[in-house]
Curated annotation (Swiss-Prot):
Modified residues (N6-carboxylysine): K146
Cofactor info, note text: Binds 2 Zn(2+) ions per subunit.
Role description: Catalyzes the conversion of allantoin (5-ureidohydantoin) to allantoic acid by hydrolytic cleavage of the five-member hydantoin ring.
Annotated gene: allB
Pathways involved: Nitrogen metabolism; (S)-allantoin degradation; allantoate from (S)-allantoin: step 1/1
Family under the similarity heading: Belongs to the metallo-dependent hydrolases superfamily. Allantoinase family.
Substrates-to-products reaction catalysed: (S)-allantoin + H2O = allantoate + H(+)
Any GO BP: purine nucleobase catabolic process
Top EC class, one word: hydrolase
Organism annotation: Salmonella typhimurium (strain LT2 / SGSC1412 / ATCC 700720)
Protein residues bound to Zn(2+) 2: K146, H186, H242
GO cellular component: cytoplasm
Pfam families, alphabetized: Amidohydro_1
Record protein name field: Allantoinase
Length: 453
Protein backbone atom coordinates (compact mmCIF):
# COMPACT_ATOMS: atom_id res chain seq x y z
CA UNK A 1 0.00 0.00 0.00
CA UNK A 2 1.13 3.54 -0.73
CA UNK A 3 0.54 6.27 1.87
CA UNK A 4 0.51 10.05 1.68
CA UNK A 5 3.35 10.32 4.20
CA UNK A 6 5.69 8.09 6.15
CA UNK A 7 7.77 9.41 9.05
CA UNK A 8 10.81 7.21 9.57
CA UNK A 9 13.33 6.55 12.32
CA UNK A 10 12.02 8.91 14.99
CA UNK A 11 11.67 8.07 18.68
CA UNK A 12 7.88 8.09 18.82
CA UNK A 13 5.96 8.89 22.00
CA UNK A 14 3.19 6.30 22.24
CA UNK A 15 0.72 6.05 25.09
CA UNK A 16 2.75 3.76 27.33
CA UNK A 17 6.18 3.65 25.71
CA UNK A 18 8.54 5.51 23.40
CA UNK A 19 10.52 3.69 20.71
CA UNK A 20 12.04 4.10 17.28
CA UNK A 21 9.24 3.23 14.89
CA UNK A 22 7.68 4.53 11.66
CA UNK A 23 4.34 6.31 11.23
CA UNK A 24 2.21 6.15 8.08
CA UNK A 25 -0.32 8.89 7.32
CA UNK A 26 -3.23 8.72 4.90
CA UNK A 27 -5.95 11.33 4.43
CA UNK A 28 -4.76 13.36 7.40
CA UNK A 29 -5.06 10.40 9.77
CA UNK A 30 -2.50 8.05 11.27
CA UNK A 31 -2.98 4.91 9.20
CA UNK A 32 -0.33 2.60 10.65
CA UNK A 33 2.55 2.43 13.12
CA UNK A 34 5.32 -0.12 12.68
CA UNK A 35 8.27 -1.14 10.56
CA UNK A 36 8.55 -1.65 6.80
CA UNK A 37 5.24 0.12 6.21
CA UNK A 38 5.67 0.38 2.45
CA UNK A 39 5.80 3.30 0.05
CA UNK A 40 4.65 6.90 0.41
CA UNK A 41 4.35 10.03 -1.70
CA UNK A 42 6.41 11.87 0.92
CA UNK A 43 8.93 10.59 3.45
CA UNK A 44 10.26 12.52 6.44
CA UNK A 45 13.36 11.28 8.22
CA UNK A 46 13.15 11.87 11.97
CA UNK A 47 16.44 10.22 12.91
CA UNK A 48 17.68 11.58 16.22
CA UNK A 49 14.40 13.40 16.88
CA UNK A 50 11.54 12.88 19.32
CA UNK A 51 8.16 12.57 17.59
CA UNK A 52 5.49 13.72 20.02
CA UNK A 53 1.74 14.12 19.74
CA UNK A 54 1.00 17.74 18.88
CA UNK A 55 0.33 19.69 22.04
CA UNK A 56 -3.30 20.22 23.01
CA UNK A 57 -3.19 23.58 24.79
CA UNK A 58 -6.33 23.67 26.92
CA UNK A 59 -5.96 27.31 27.99
CA UNK A 60 -5.36 29.95 25.31
CA UNK A 61 -6.57 33.54 25.02
CA UNK A 62 -6.92 34.92 21.49
CA UNK A 63 -8.41 38.40 21.81
CA UNK A 64 -10.12 38.54 18.42
CA UNK A 65 -12.57 40.11 17.73
CA UNK A 66 -12.62 43.37 19.64
CA UNK A 67 -9.09 43.35 21.05
CA UNK A 68 -7.07 42.12 18.09
CA UNK A 69 -4.39 44.64 19.07
CA UNK A 70 -3.74 42.33 22.05
CA UNK A 71 -3.44 39.09 20.08
CA UNK A 72 -5.14 37.87 16.89
CA UNK A 73 -5.84 34.51 15.30
CA UNK A 74 -3.18 34.92 12.63
CA UNK A 75 -0.30 35.75 14.96
CA UNK A 76 -1.44 33.62 17.87
CA UNK A 77 -1.91 30.41 15.93
CA UNK A 78 1.36 30.85 14.03
CA UNK A 79 3.12 31.14 17.38
CA UNK A 80 1.29 28.02 18.54
CA UNK A 81 2.41 26.04 15.49
CA UNK A 82 6.00 27.21 15.91
CA UNK A 83 5.82 25.99 19.49
CA UNK A 84 4.46 22.54 18.65
CA UNK A 85 0.81 23.18 19.51
CA UNK A 86 -1.62 21.64 17.01
CA UNK A 87 -4.89 22.20 18.90
CA UNK A 88 -5.85 25.02 21.24
CA UNK A 89 -8.89 25.32 23.46
CA UNK A 90 -9.78 28.96 23.43
CA UNK A 91 -10.97 30.89 26.45
CA UNK A 92 -14.18 32.95 26.25
CA UNK A 93 -12.61 36.16 27.52
CA UNK A 94 -10.25 38.98 26.55
CA UNK A 95 -12.06 39.37 23.23
CA UNK A 96 -14.98 41.78 22.94
CA UNK A 97 -17.72 40.82 23.21
CA UNK A 98 -17.03 37.94 25.58
CA UNK A 99 -18.18 34.53 24.32
CA UNK A 100 -21.38 34.15 26.32
CA UNK A 101 -24.14 33.20 23.82
CA UNK A 102 -24.80 32.03 20.27
CA UNK A 103 -24.28 35.44 18.68
CA UNK A 104 -20.93 36.10 20.32
CA UNK A 105 -19.46 32.69 19.48
CA UNK A 106 -20.50 33.15 15.86
CA UNK A 107 -18.49 36.38 15.88
CA UNK A 108 -15.45 34.31 16.89
CA UNK A 109 -15.99 31.87 14.04
CA UNK A 110 -16.32 34.72 11.55
CA UNK A 111 -13.24 36.52 12.86
CA UNK A 112 -11.08 33.41 12.48
CA UNK A 113 -11.92 32.57 8.87
CA UNK A 114 -8.76 31.91 6.88
CA UNK A 115 -6.49 32.70 9.84
CA UNK A 116 -6.17 29.45 11.83
CA UNK A 117 -2.80 27.77 11.43
CA UNK A 118 -3.85 25.12 14.00
CA UNK A 119 -7.15 23.54 15.03
CA UNK A 120 -9.24 25.13 17.77
CA UNK A 121 -12.03 24.19 20.15
CA UNK A 122 -14.05 26.76 22.04
CA UNK A 123 -15.11 27.31 25.63
CA UNK A 124 -18.22 29.23 26.51
CA UNK A 125 -18.38 31.67 29.37
CA UNK A 126 -20.33 31.25 32.59
CA UNK A 127 -20.82 34.83 33.73
CA UNK A 128 -23.15 36.76 35.98
CA UNK A 129 -25.46 37.73 33.12
CA UNK A 130 -25.92 34.62 30.92
CA UNK A 131 -27.37 31.87 33.12
CA UNK A 132 -30.41 31.63 30.84
CA UNK A 133 -28.30 31.33 27.66
CA UNK A 134 -25.77 28.64 28.54
CA UNK A 135 -27.71 26.11 26.46
CA UNK A 136 -27.02 28.14 23.31
CA UNK A 137 -23.28 27.59 23.63
CA UNK A 138 -23.75 23.90 24.40
CA UNK A 139 -25.88 23.54 21.27
CA UNK A 140 -23.21 25.23 19.15
CA UNK A 141 -20.61 22.75 20.42
CA UNK A 142 -18.32 24.26 23.06
CA UNK A 143 -16.23 21.71 24.97
CA UNK A 144 -16.58 23.37 28.38
CA UNK A 145 -17.51 26.55 30.24
CA UNK A 146 -15.05 28.90 31.95
CA UNK A 147 -15.82 31.07 34.95
CA UNK A 148 -13.99 33.18 37.52
CA UNK A 149 -14.56 33.32 41.25
CA UNK A 150 -11.73 35.89 41.28
CA UNK A 151 -12.55 39.42 40.13
CA UNK A 152 -12.28 39.87 36.36
CA UNK A 153 -13.50 42.05 33.52
CA UNK A 154 -13.64 45.78 32.86
CA UNK A 155 -16.71 47.11 34.66
CA UNK A 156 -16.79 50.03 32.25
CA UNK A 157 -17.45 47.74 29.27
CA UNK A 158 -20.93 46.20 29.13
CA UNK A 159 -20.03 43.10 27.10
CA UNK A 160 -16.77 42.22 28.85
CA UNK A 161 -16.38 39.02 30.90
CA UNK A 162 -17.62 39.00 34.51
CA UNK A 163 -16.89 36.86 37.53
CA UNK A 164 -19.63 34.92 39.31
CA UNK A 165 -20.70 34.83 42.94
CA UNK A 166 -21.36 31.56 44.74
CA UNK A 167 -25.06 31.53 43.86
CA UNK A 168 -24.40 32.14 40.17
CA UNK A 169 -21.70 29.48 40.13
CA UNK A 170 -23.95 26.92 41.80
CA UNK A 171 -26.92 27.59 39.50
CA UNK A 172 -24.70 27.64 36.43
CA UNK A 173 -22.96 24.41 37.42
CA UNK A 174 -26.35 22.75 37.93
CA UNK A 175 -27.34 23.65 34.38
CA UNK A 176 -23.99 22.55 32.96
CA UNK A 177 -24.16 19.25 34.81
CA UNK A 178 -27.49 18.55 33.14
CA UNK A 179 -25.80 19.22 29.77
CA UNK A 180 -22.93 16.83 30.61
CA UNK A 181 -20.54 19.76 30.37
CA UNK A 182 -17.41 20.64 32.34
CA UNK A 183 -17.05 23.85 34.32
CA UNK A 184 -13.54 25.35 34.41
CA UNK A 185 -12.73 27.76 37.22
CA UNK A 186 -10.12 30.41 37.96
CA UNK A 187 -9.79 29.87 41.71
CA UNK A 188 -8.74 32.80 43.89
CA UNK A 189 -10.75 34.45 46.67
CA UNK A 190 -11.97 37.64 45.02
CA UNK A 191 -12.60 39.85 48.05
CA UNK A 192 -9.42 38.98 49.94
CA UNK A 193 -7.16 39.33 46.87
CA UNK A 194 -8.79 42.63 45.92
CA UNK A 195 -8.47 44.09 49.42
CA UNK A 196 -4.89 42.91 49.91
CA UNK A 197 -3.99 44.43 46.54
CA UNK A 198 -5.59 47.78 47.35
CA UNK A 199 -3.93 47.82 50.76
CA UNK A 200 -0.52 47.24 49.17
CA UNK A 201 -1.06 50.06 46.66
CA UNK A 202 -2.09 52.50 49.40
CA UNK A 203 1.05 51.66 51.35
CA UNK A 204 3.33 51.93 48.30
CA UNK A 205 4.22 48.24 48.22
CA UNK A 206 4.50 47.62 44.48
CA UNK A 207 7.30 45.08 43.93
CA UNK A 208 6.91 41.56 42.55
CA UNK A 209 7.22 40.15 46.07
CA UNK A 210 4.47 42.53 47.21
CA UNK A 211 2.20 41.40 44.39
CA UNK A 212 2.74 37.73 45.26
CA UNK A 213 2.02 38.53 48.93
CA UNK A 214 -1.28 40.12 47.89
CA UNK A 215 -2.46 36.81 46.40
CA UNK A 216 -1.28 34.30 49.02
CA UNK A 217 -1.59 30.54 48.67
CA UNK A 218 -4.54 30.34 51.06
CA UNK A 219 -6.66 32.49 48.71
CA UNK A 220 -6.20 29.88 46.00
CA UNK A 221 -6.76 26.93 48.34
CA UNK A 222 -9.93 28.42 49.83
CA UNK A 223 -11.41 29.04 46.40
CA UNK A 224 -10.54 25.53 45.21
CA UNK A 225 -12.19 24.01 48.30
CA UNK A 226 -15.30 26.12 47.74
CA UNK A 227 -15.78 25.33 44.07
CA UNK A 228 -15.07 21.64 44.68
CA UNK A 229 -17.88 21.56 47.23
CA UNK A 230 -20.30 23.59 45.13
CA UNK A 231 -19.59 21.67 41.92
CA UNK A 232 -20.16 18.40 43.77
CA UNK A 233 -23.44 19.69 45.20
CA UNK A 234 -24.47 20.89 41.74
CA UNK A 235 -23.59 17.59 40.06
CA UNK A 236 -21.12 19.07 37.58
CA UNK A 237 -17.74 17.88 36.35
CA UNK A 238 -15.00 20.35 37.40
CA UNK A 239 -11.65 21.40 35.94
CA UNK A 240 -9.47 23.68 38.08
CA UNK A 241 -7.43 26.08 35.97
CA UNK A 242 -3.75 27.04 36.32
CA UNK A 243 -3.07 25.78 39.84
CA UNK A 244 0.00 27.54 41.23
CA UNK A 245 0.55 25.84 44.60
CA UNK A 246 1.07 22.27 45.82
CA UNK A 247 -1.52 22.94 48.52
CA UNK A 248 -4.06 23.69 45.80
CA UNK A 249 -3.20 20.48 43.99
CA UNK A 250 -3.68 18.56 47.24
CA UNK A 251 -7.29 19.74 47.44
CA UNK A 252 -7.98 18.32 43.98
CA UNK A 253 -6.22 15.06 44.81
CA UNK A 254 -8.25 14.65 48.00
CA UNK A 255 -11.53 15.26 46.17
CA UNK A 256 -10.53 12.84 43.42
CA UNK A 257 -9.72 10.16 45.99
CA UNK A 258 -13.20 10.68 47.43
CA UNK A 259 -14.71 9.99 44.03
CA UNK A 260 -15.37 13.47 42.67
CA UNK A 261 -15.08 13.98 38.91
CA UNK A 262 -12.40 16.68 38.89
CA UNK A 263 -9.24 17.44 36.92
CA UNK A 264 -6.66 20.20 37.06
CA UNK A 265 -3.99 21.96 35.02
CA UNK A 266 -0.91 24.03 35.62
CA UNK A 267 1.43 26.13 33.46
CA UNK A 268 5.14 26.05 32.60
CA UNK A 269 5.78 29.40 34.26
CA UNK A 270 4.96 27.96 37.69
CA UNK A 271 7.70 25.34 37.19
CA UNK A 272 10.48 27.37 35.58
CA UNK A 273 10.13 30.87 37.07
CA UNK A 274 10.12 31.93 40.72
CA UNK A 275 9.42 35.17 42.56
CA UNK A 276 13.04 36.34 42.46
CA UNK A 277 13.09 35.88 38.68
CA UNK A 278 9.70 37.62 38.49
CA UNK A 279 11.30 40.58 40.26
CA UNK A 280 14.13 40.63 37.70
CA UNK A 281 11.92 40.18 34.63
CA UNK A 282 9.28 42.64 35.78
CA UNK A 283 5.72 43.03 34.56
CA UNK A 284 6.11 40.58 31.64
CA UNK A 285 6.02 37.80 34.26
CA UNK A 286 2.93 39.08 36.08
CA UNK A 287 -0.01 36.71 36.08
CA UNK A 288 -2.64 35.43 38.45
CA UNK A 289 -2.36 33.24 40.37
CA UNK A 290 1.15 34.65 40.75
CA UNK A 291 4.55 33.06 40.27
CA UNK A 292 5.60 31.93 43.74
CA UNK A 293 8.86 31.15 45.56
CA UNK A 294 11.36 28.33 45.02
CA UNK A 295 9.97 26.17 47.82
CA UNK A 296 6.52 26.37 46.25
CA UNK A 297 8.03 25.51 42.87
CA UNK A 298 9.76 22.45 44.33
CA UNK A 299 6.41 21.25 45.64
CA UNK A 300 4.80 21.77 42.24
CA UNK A 301 7.44 19.58 40.57
CA UNK A 302 6.71 16.85 43.11
CA UNK A 303 2.99 17.02 42.37
CA UNK A 304 3.65 16.93 38.63
CA UNK A 305 5.85 13.84 38.83
CA UNK A 306 3.35 12.19 41.20
CA UNK A 307 0.70 12.40 38.48
CA UNK A 308 -1.53 14.75 40.48
CA UNK A 309 -1.63 17.43 37.73
CA UNK A 310 -3.50 16.29 34.63
CA UNK A 311 -2.18 18.62 31.95
CA UNK A 312 0.12 21.53 31.23
CA UNK A 313 -1.26 24.59 29.44
CA UNK A 314 0.09 27.94 28.32
CA UNK A 315 -2.54 30.32 29.73
CA UNK A 316 -1.31 32.56 26.90
CA UNK A 317 -2.79 35.95 27.82
CA UNK A 318 -0.86 38.78 26.16
CA UNK A 319 -1.67 42.48 25.95
CA UNK A 320 -0.22 45.60 24.28
CA UNK A 321 3.12 46.74 25.77
CA UNK A 322 1.62 49.92 27.21
CA UNK A 323 -0.57 47.78 29.49
CA UNK A 324 2.60 46.27 30.96
CA UNK A 325 4.03 49.72 31.75
CA UNK A 326 4.32 51.13 35.26
CA UNK A 327 4.79 49.17 38.44
CA UNK A 328 3.84 45.55 38.94
CA UNK A 329 0.71 46.28 40.97
CA UNK A 330 -0.66 48.48 38.16
CA UNK A 331 0.27 46.36 35.13
CA UNK A 332 -1.99 43.93 33.29
CA UNK A 333 -1.64 40.38 34.56
CA UNK A 334 -1.01 37.88 31.80
CA UNK A 335 1.92 35.99 30.28
CA UNK A 336 2.75 35.44 26.61
CA UNK A 337 3.77 31.78 26.70
CA UNK A 338 2.13 29.97 23.80
CA UNK A 339 5.26 29.49 21.71
CA UNK A 340 7.48 28.03 24.42
CA UNK A 341 5.43 25.47 26.32
CA UNK A 342 6.79 22.35 24.64
CA UNK A 343 10.45 23.22 24.27
CA UNK A 344 10.78 24.70 27.76
CA UNK A 345 8.99 21.79 29.45
CA UNK A 346 10.81 19.16 27.40
CA UNK A 347 14.07 20.73 28.52
CA UNK A 348 13.10 21.20 32.16
CA UNK A 349 11.01 18.06 32.75
CA UNK A 350 12.51 15.44 30.43
CA UNK A 351 16.13 16.50 29.97
CA UNK A 352 16.90 18.04 33.35
CA UNK A 353 14.63 16.02 35.66
CA UNK A 354 14.22 12.68 33.89
CA UNK A 355 10.51 12.65 33.13
CA UNK A 356 9.56 9.72 30.91
CA UNK A 357 8.51 10.49 27.35
CA UNK A 358 5.08 8.84 27.75
CA UNK A 359 4.37 11.02 30.79
CA UNK A 360 5.45 14.09 28.83
CA UNK A 361 3.06 13.12 26.03
CA UNK A 362 0.17 12.71 28.45
CA UNK A 363 0.79 16.06 30.15
CA UNK A 364 1.17 17.99 26.89
CA UNK A 365 -1.49 16.31 24.74
CA UNK A 366 -3.29 13.12 25.70
CA UNK A 367 -4.90 14.09 28.99
CA UNK A 368 -6.23 17.42 27.75
CA UNK A 369 -7.75 15.73 24.69
CA UNK A 370 -9.45 13.19 26.96
CA UNK A 371 -10.70 15.74 29.50
CA UNK A 372 -12.37 17.87 26.84
CA UNK A 373 -13.59 15.09 24.57
CA UNK A 374 -11.36 15.80 21.57
CA UNK A 375 -11.74 12.30 20.17
CA UNK A 376 -9.31 12.60 17.26
CA UNK A 377 -6.54 14.45 19.09
CA UNK A 378 -3.80 13.86 21.62
CA UNK A 379 -2.37 10.44 20.70
CA UNK A 380 -0.11 8.86 18.15
CA UNK A 381 -2.33 5.90 17.31
CA UNK A 382 -4.10 4.54 14.19
CA UNK A 383 -7.27 6.46 13.42
CA UNK A 384 -6.21 9.64 15.21
CA UNK A 385 -5.46 12.91 13.43
CA UNK A 386 -1.86 13.02 12.25
CA UNK A 387 -0.94 15.90 14.56
CA UNK A 388 2.76 15.50 15.28
CA UNK A 389 5.73 17.48 16.53
CA UNK A 390 9.43 16.86 15.95
CA UNK A 391 11.58 17.81 18.94
CA UNK A 392 15.35 18.04 18.64
CA UNK A 393 16.76 17.14 22.07
CA UNK A 394 19.99 18.53 23.49
CA UNK A 395 19.88 21.47 21.10
CA UNK A 396 20.28 24.73 22.98
CA UNK A 397 19.30 28.17 21.76
CA UNK A 398 18.72 31.54 23.38
CA UNK A 399 15.20 32.87 22.77
CA UNK A 400 15.18 36.32 21.18
CA UNK A 401 12.34 38.77 20.65
CA UNK A 402 12.57 38.35 16.88
CA UNK A 403 11.96 34.60 17.25
CA UNK A 404 8.44 35.26 18.50
CA UNK A 405 5.38 35.16 16.25
CA UNK A 406 3.10 37.01 18.68
CA UNK A 407 1.53 40.30 17.73
CA UNK A 408 3.77 41.87 20.38
CA UNK A 409 7.17 40.22 20.41
CA UNK A 410 7.68 40.05 24.16
CA UNK A 411 7.79 37.14 26.59
CA UNK A 412 9.23 36.42 30.03
CA UNK A 413 11.25 33.65 28.36
CA UNK A 414 13.23 36.03 26.11
CA UNK A 415 16.91 35.68 26.99
CA UNK A 416 16.42 32.18 28.36
CA UNK A 417 18.64 29.35 27.13
CA UNK A 418 16.29 26.53 26.11
CA UNK A 419 17.86 23.11 25.66
CA UNK A 420 15.55 21.66 22.99
CA UNK A 421 13.99 22.88 19.74
CA UNK A 422 10.75 22.32 17.87
CA UNK A 423 11.88 21.56 14.32
CA UNK A 424 8.63 20.57 12.63
CA UNK A 425 4.89 20.69 13.38
CA UNK A 426 2.39 18.59 11.43
CA UNK A 427 -1.38 19.15 11.43
CA UNK A 428 -3.56 16.42 9.96
CA UNK A 429 -0.67 15.18 7.84
CA UNK A 430 0.57 18.53 6.52
CA UNK A 431 3.71 20.30 7.71
CA UNK A 432 2.46 23.64 9.05
CA UNK A 433 5.78 24.75 10.56
CA UNK A 434 9.36 23.89 9.69
CA UNK A 435 12.37 25.37 11.44
CA UNK A 436 14.14 25.97 8.11
CA UNK A 437 11.20 26.93 5.88
CA UNK A 438 8.80 28.65 8.27
CA UNK A 439 5.12 28.18 7.46
CA UNK A 440 4.97 26.31 4.13
CA UNK A 441 1.19 26.03 3.66
CA UNK A 442 -1.71 28.49 3.99
CA UNK A 443 -3.66 28.36 7.27
CA UNK A 444 -5.65 25.10 7.33
CA UNK A 445 -6.92 25.05 10.92
CA UNK A 446 -10.51 24.15 11.71
CA UNK A 447 -12.87 24.66 14.63
CA UNK A 448 -13.69 21.48 16.54
CA UNK A 449 -17.28 21.32 17.78
CA UNK A 450 -18.25 18.92 20.55
CA UNK A 451 -21.21 17.38 18.72
CA UNK A 452 -19.64 17.20 15.25
CA UNK A 453 -16.55 15.03 15.73
Amino acid sequence: MSFDLIIKNGTVILENEARVIDIAVQGGKIAAIGENLGEAKNVLDATGLIVSPGMVDAHTHISEPGRTHWEGYETGTRAAAKGGITTMIEMPLNQLPATVDRETIELKFDAAKGKLTIDAAQLGGLVSYNLDRLHELDEVGVVGFKCFVATCGDRGIDNDFRDVNDWQFYKGAQKLGEMDQTVLVHCENALICDELGEEAKREGRVTAHDYVASRPVFTEVEAIRRVLYLAKAAGCRLHVCHISSPEGVEEVTRARQEGQDVTCESCPHYFVLDTDQFEEIGTLAKCSPPIRDQENQKGMWEKLFNGEIDCLVSDHSPCPPEMKAGNIMQAWGGIAGLQNCMDVMFDEAVQKRGMSLPMFGKLMATNAADIFGLKHKGRIAPGKDADLVFIQPDSSYVLKNEDLEYRHKVSPYVGRTIGARITKTILRGDVIYDIEHGFPVPPKGQFILKHQQ
